[in-house]
């Protein structure tokens, strides 16, 4: 069994946040041997209906490839890819040590895995195993099993099906070659005022304002990530 362990003692270790589609990655806040994600978070609309919906991207880690200069400056040296931990996450056990203050509303924190196969990027959220965020440190353990009933496939918004789609869970789990993320899902997107068009065709906070009071706010501190693979 090979184990990945990130304690953030020497920096973000490859973990980062996200600004938006146009501007890409951003550094996470740093605490004492921790990384911190704090609201307001961007509304990820890439999977708007007919996809699975909207989410906030709190923490991200690339699982393969060679990051460029900007990515390295944002996220530090990626200890996952440097350590050669591989992209097969089938039945991997993830243990997270975290805490925070979160006005989560009807969302929960979940693991999201993404892989690109035959030109299609597929995301699966482990919605059957929510990750609890409490005000005191706790360890949360989840298992990336192959039972599709535990997962939700993200699919694609109406105009991104050239890139996003659906590949079987077992295929993606066996080669999570894009990234893993911790996300808040699902978001309640409420347009502020009348719209001239379909809210799912238009892009929230880019094409129209939304009621931020309907969205999560707060912060999450991540102290340790352990991934055990068989």
Residue ranges with predicted function:
Residues 1-230:
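Beta-rich carbohydrate-recognition modules and glycan-binding surfaces
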């Amino acid at each position: 069994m090979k184990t990945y362990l990130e304690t953030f003692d020497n920096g973000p270790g490859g973990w980062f946040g996200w600004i938006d589609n146009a501007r890409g990655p951003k550094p996470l806040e740093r605490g004492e041997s921790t990384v911190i994600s704090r609201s307001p978070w961007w509304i990820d609309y890439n999977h708007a209906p007919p996809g699975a919906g909207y989410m906030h991207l709190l923490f991200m880690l690339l699982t393969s490839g060679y990051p460029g200069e900007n990515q390295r400056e944002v996220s530090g040296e990626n200890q996952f890819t440097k350590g050669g931990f591989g992209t097969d996450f089938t039945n991997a056990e993830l243990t997270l040590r975290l805490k925070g203050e979160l006005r989560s509303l009807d969302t929960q924190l979940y693991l999201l895995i993404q892989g690109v196969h035959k030109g299609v990027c597929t995301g699966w959220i482990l919605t059957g195993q929510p990750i609890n965020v409490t005000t005191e440190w706790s360890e949360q353990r989840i298992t990336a099993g192959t039972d599709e009933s535990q997962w939700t496939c993200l699919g694609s918004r109406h105009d991104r099906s050239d890139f996003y789609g659906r590949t079987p869970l077992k295929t993606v789990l066996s080669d999570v070659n894009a990234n893993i993320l911790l996300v808040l899902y699902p978001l309640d997107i409420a347009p502020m005022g009348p719209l001239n068009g379909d809210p799912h065709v238009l892009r929230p906070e880019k094409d129209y304002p939304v009621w931020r009071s309907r969205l999560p706010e707060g912060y999450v501190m991540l102290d340790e990530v352990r991934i055990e693979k068989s």
